[in-house]
Amino acid sequence: MGYSMAKNVRQKMDSDATLYINDINASACEKFKSEFSSHGPIEIVSTAREASENSKVVISIVPGAVDVKKVYLDEKDGVIAGKPDEERVLCECSTIDVKSTREVGEALKAKGMGTYVDTPVSVSSIRCACNLILISS
């Protein structure tokens, strides 16, 4: 799901803007960059921290709450380890429990990392192909 979403984001972004991508599957990042760099710059980064420090908008989608906490709250490589930016928007698209969502959002707010938005999505391969993603917030 993340691959198709990233494809749509890269295709719709300003062609001068850089899309920073990260995935535990490095070959997926390389494939994505190869396929879509004609739409604009794509940088593969090794951590969520690196991605967020270079971005005003962060969109993440991972399998579960443990993964969300790692992306955002890991003290070395997570978003929270980076430089604060009150204007940054952090859209977390995974479907996770309310307690975890609040925990992550409160921790990020306390550190001035930006606005955390719980944005679970309803998407399928067909919807992605049609550029349709339903966002619940």
Residue ranges and their predicted role:
Residues 1-60, 89, 125-128:
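NAD(P)+-binding Rossmann beta1-loop-alpha1 motif at the extreme N-terminus of oxidoreductases
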